[in-house]
C-alpha cells in the first residue's frame, strides 16, 4: 500500500504540476492553502497512525506534500483528517477547492470487497481553537466527494495518475473560525491540494461611477446592492437614478442601474471628467463631448459652459449653443413698386447679408399722404394685401384697394431671429402715386333690336371719390362719330340703336381730380328683327345643337380613351395632372407568348457560364428553390461583383421551368434605377440560375422592422419616391405587377429601393383599359385593390392601390396591413369604406396621397406619373412634411383590448410589450421596477426615456400605447 502511494505520488505530482489552475471569477481571498504551506500545517489524524498519512516527494528540487490513505484490504474504515483552526475574518461564505486522486477498487487483488471510491467532507464552526481535542459530533457533513475519473491498473503501467478537482461552498458562517475534516470510509485516496477562500466583488469604475470593493454575499439567490459615487466633476443627470450595482455571491458585479454624466464644462476622457480645453465648451450635463466654439464667438476659457458672442453678433433664445452667433440682416435689396390702377405690386430681392441665418422674414408697412394738405398717416384698414404683410417669406406682395390721387410710401423691413435683440432696423422704402381709379368691370345685362343694357362695378373704397360715370359708345367700324352718356348710377340702357349691329362700349369713372382709368372696350351686338320674333324657335334649335355637340364629344372621348393610355382623373379632380401621357418608346413583350420560353430568354437575357458564378451562402428560399449570395466574374475576368443567385430546385416540373425562365425573360426587358437588375441566366446547365444584382439590406419590410424609428421622414419619402419611379417605368411599358408589397421591394446599402419579384406580374395589352384575369391563383388580399379581388382583373390602377399599402407599410416601419384581421374581415372592411388609419408621425400630405390611392373607383386614383411628381414636390419642399396628419393611437397602433377570452386586461408587462412589438425592452422595464401593469400605466414620457428607450419612434409607440392601456385598465376597474 505504501509503495503504491509513494509511486503514485511521483507520477501524480508530475501531472499536478502541469495542470492549469481553474479560472476564478471575482477577487479571491485565500484563507487556507495546503499545497502552498509545504507540509508545515500539521493536520490532526484520527485514529492516530492508522489512517491518513502525510507523504513527501521531491520534484525540481522542491518538496511536494500530500495526505493519502489506502486501507482497502482491512475491512470497514473510519479514518479522519482534520485541518487546523482557520480564522474566518470577514468571510460569510467560503469556497473549498480539492485536488485528489482515487484508485480503482478493481485494481486490487480479489477486488477488495470493502473498498470504496469516495470520501466525505465535513466542517465545524467554533470561536476557539480546540487544539488536538477532536470530537466527531461537532462536525457537519458538507458532501460526499466522488471522483470524475478513477486511476485504473493500465494508468499505473503508463505512469499516469488521473487528477480530480472538486469545489464546494459553505455559508453563511457566523462563528470566528472553522475546521474542515475529511473522512475515509475505505478508499484509496491521495489529497494533493486543499484551498479555502472567499470572494469579493473588486473595486470598479463604470459609467463614471466608483464602486468600492465589496464582500460577496452568503446567500446564492440574493444580490448585495452597492451604491456608487460619481467621479470628480460628474453628477447624476436631472431626473436620473443614483448609480447602483449588485454584488453576486460569485464576486461578479451585476445589474447596473443609473449612471453619472460629466457636468457642464467637462467631457468624458476614459474613466474621468476632464475640463473642456480653451476654445471649447459644453453647456449641459450629457454624454456628448466638448464642442469647439462656433463662428463669431470669443475664445472661451478652460471648463467653459458657453462661448460669448462677438460684439455686434447675438444668439436668439431658441438657438442651440453650438450654433454660430448671428446678426440682423441688411436691408432688402432692389425694392420696386409698380402701380396698376388701384393696385401696387411690390418686389424686392433678399438682403445681401443674411446675418448668417436662414430664418429671414419680411414686414411691409404702408403710409399714405394727401396731396392737398401734405399730411401723412398709416394706410387705412381698407387696404388689402395679397398675403399677411408681417412674417412674409416670399419677396413680393400685391397691395390693392388703394385710393386714387393719393401718394403711398411702402417700407419693407428684413428681420431674422436676432432682430428683436437690437433697436436698429434694416429696411428699404419705395413711393408711388395713384392717379386713377381702377378700371370699371363692364358686363352686358340685356339687349333688343334697338337697345343694349350695360352695368359695371369698381372697388367700394373708390366709389366715394367718383361723382359720375361716362359711357362712350359707337358703331364698330365708324371712327368718325361717337355718343357719350353720363350717369351717377352703375348701369345704363343705350337706346335708339340700329338692329343687328355691333357697338363698341367703354365706361370711365369721373372724379373731382379728373378722369379715372377707362374700362376695356367691349363689343356688344343688338338683335336682328327676325331673331326677336322667333326667339323660341332659335332656343329649341340651340338646345338640339348643344345635345348633338355633347354626344359628339362623348364619342370622341371614348375613342381617345381606347386609343391612348387610360387617364384616371375626373374633370372636377384638379389634384392630378390632366396632360396625356405619351406612349412609351419600348413596350413590354410577354415571354409566355413565345412557343418556346427559351427563345425569350435568348432574346432578352445574357447567358452566363457556370464557371463565372460562385455560390457562397444561402440567404433565403424562393418559389422555385434556394436563393444564394455569391459572386460573378466580370467579362474581363479581373473583378468579381456580389450578386444574388436564384436556383431552380431539382425535380422541377415543366410548368416550373417555364415560369422560372419566364421571370428571367421579364426582368431582362427592364432597365431602370429602381427595378432590380438582371445580370444574366444559366439555362444550359443544371441547376438553372437567375443572377441579379445583390441588395445588401434585403426585403424592405424586414429592413424597416429592424431599423424601427431610425430614419427621418424625408428619408422614408425618398424611399417611396424610388418605388414610385420604378412603378412609373413599368406602367409606361404597359406592365402590371399584381404583387406590389414591401416584401417584394429590395433595398441596397445606399437605401435605394428597387421593385422585384415578377412571379405574379403580367402584361397589359395595348388597350389602356386592358386587364389580366388570373386562372384561380392566390391573390395577396391585404395589398390588392377591391376590383381585382372581386373580378380577378388587374390594371395599373390596382397597382396604385397596392402602392398606397406600401406607403403605409413604410411609414409604420413594416407593420402588417390590417393587423390580425382575417382576409375575409379585410375584404368586408374595405367594401364598407374602411381604410387603414394614419401612421404615427405621418405627414398630412403623405396620408392624403395614400387615401387618393385607395379610392374605391379606380378611375379616380392617381397615375404613377402623378405620384412621382407629388413626391418630388414634397422632397423639394421639406417644410411641407412638417404638418402631421391627425393620429389616434387607439386606432393607428393596433392594441388587443384584452388578453385571454375572459376580457381580462394584459396580465403581464411582457405580454403587453409583445402586443405592440416592443418586447426587446422587457428587461429594461423589469430592471427599473415596472413589473406589473398597475405600475406601467403610471409611467410618464420621462420615465420611458429613463429606463433606456432611446429611439424617438419607440418612445412614441410606447407612450401612445399607454393611452389606450390606461383606458382598458380603467374600464375594468383596476385601481391605479
Curated annotation (Swiss-Prot):
Single GO cellular component term: dendrite
Cytoplasmic side: 559-976
EC number in record: 2.7.10.1
Subcellular localization, as worded in the UniProt entry: Cell membrane; Cell projection, Ruffle membrane; Cell projection, Lamellipodium membrane; Cell junction, Focal adhesion
Residue numbers carrying Phosphotyrosine: 575, 588, 594, 628, 735, 772, 921, 930
Record motif PDZ-binding, residues: 974-976
Similarity-based family: Belongs to the protein kinase superfamily. Tyr protein kinase family. Ephrin receptor subfamily.
Subunit structure: Homodimer. Interacts with SLA. Interacts (phosphorylated form) with VAV2, VAV3 and PI3-kinase p85 subunit (PIK3R1, PIK3R2 or PIK3R3); critical for the EFNA1-induced activation of RAC1 which stimulates cell migration. Interacts with INPPL1; regulates activated EPHA2 endocytosis and degradation. Interacts (inactivated form) with PTK2/FAK1 and interacts (EFNA1 ligand-activated form) with PTPN11; regulates integrin-mediated adhesion. Interacts with ARHGEF16, DOCK4 and ELMO2; mediates ligand-independent activation of RAC1 which stimulates cell migration.
UniProt protein name: Ephrin type-A receptor 2
Species: Macaca fascicularis
Name of the gene encoding the protein in the UniProt record: EPHA2
